[in-house]
Design a protein with these regions (language model features):
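A short beta-loop-alpha structural element at the N-terminal edge
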Residues: 4-17
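Conserved acetyl-CoA-binding loop of GNAT-fold acetyltransferases
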Residues: 124-134
Length: 151
């Protein structure tokens, strides 16, 4: 990547599919990158492109209640994917920070996610807490934990 700071931009849903498939569907029983909430009103897709205009990071932000506090607004983070060649470079944190800004515009109290165990340390480093026991997520068949952050 160049020395300029990567810029987070809003994406069309379809722009997320190739990167989601490459990162989030590798070694899983499915190759379908679509989520039911992709077209739900209020859903926002964020991304970062490299200097060649290739999408290298994406995340999806869905207004969805947090199960332990249903009376307040919450935003679910879905589809956080950073290209393998760019992982551990700070792009996930940039997407997270932009998503938090978005959630605050909605007066959300929480951001939550179903975090893959492989990415759990990222969420914990970024002030999320793990809630409850781990579980195997149905679509990917990978171990996950619920994580939440109050904002």
């Amino acid at each position: 990547m160049s020395n300029t700071k990567p810029k987070v931009v809003e994406l069309q849903t379809s722009e997320t599919y190739d990167l989601r498939t490459a990162v989030l569907r590798a070694d899983t029983p499915t190759s379908d990158p679509k989520y039911a909430e992709d077209t739900k009103q209020g859903t926002v897709h964020l991304g970062i492109f490299d200097e060649n205009k290739t999408l290298i990071a994406t995340s999806t932000w869905v207004i969805n209640p947090w199960q332990h506090d249903l009376l307040v607004t919450a935003v679910q983070l879905r589809g956080m994917a950073v290209a393998t060649s760019h992982q551990k470079s700070g792009l996930g944190k940039l997407l997270l920070d932009a998503g938090i800004v978005h959630a605050k515009t909605l007066d959300a109290k929480y951001i939550w996610a179903k975090a893959r165990d492989l990415a759990l340390a990222f969420y914990l480093r970024n002030n999320f807490v793990s809630v409850g026991d781990g579980f195997t997520e149905g679509v990917t068949q990978m171990p996950h934990h619920l994580v939440v952050r109050e904002i």
